[in-house]
């Protein structure tokens, strides 16, 4: 599987920080960012982090499998069950979990799946999420671990190296 994307840029006249503040309101997410580099700014929001390292462990939380929320809690629970039963969504999700395991094993040990196919609700979507963890020693080069796991499988596809070659 290859994840294709396109570059998009647009000139904008106005207060981009107000656009960012509006984004925070319409798409509240655990990870929000705004970088002002003088000549250009980058901002966004995401429920996903690439790699987290804390207290001797490294974590990747693959997110694959997404359904739009309806605004009706009962209907959303039904959709969550459909998501868990969907063969295509599950196949993609398991592929990303396996990719996270492989990526973490390059620079860390004792790789394991902490939870698999957990449903998480966000303001506009329902996601299927897993957590893959690995042990890291104090001597682990965290930047090397980041490089070993970059880019996330949700951005590249799998098998990662071949997908990246085809994308390039």
PLM regions and their residue ranges:
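Extended alpha-helical targeting/anchoring segments
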Residues: 1-168
């Amino acid at each position: 599987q290859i994840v294709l994307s396109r570059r998009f840029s647009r000139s904008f006249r106005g207060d981009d920080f107000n656009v960012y503040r509006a984004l925070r309101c319409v798409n509240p997410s655990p990870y929000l960012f705004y970088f002002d580099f003088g000549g250009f700014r980058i901002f966004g929001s995401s429920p996903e982090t690439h790699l987290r390292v804390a207290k001797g462990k490294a974590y990747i939380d693959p997110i694959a499998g997404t359904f739009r929320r309806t605004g009706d809690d009962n209907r959303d629970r039904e959709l969550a069950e459909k998501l868990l039963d969907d063969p295509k969504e599950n196949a993609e999700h398991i592929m990303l979990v396996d990719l996270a395991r492989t990526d973490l094993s390059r620079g860390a040990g004792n790789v394991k799946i902490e939870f698999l196919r957990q449903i998480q609700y966000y303001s506009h979507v329902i996601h299927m999420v897993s957590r893959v963890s690995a042990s890291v020693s104090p001597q682990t080069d965290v930047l090397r671990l980041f490089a070993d796991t970059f880019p996330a499988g949700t951005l590249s596809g799998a098998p990662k190296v071949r997908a990246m070659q085809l994308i390039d």
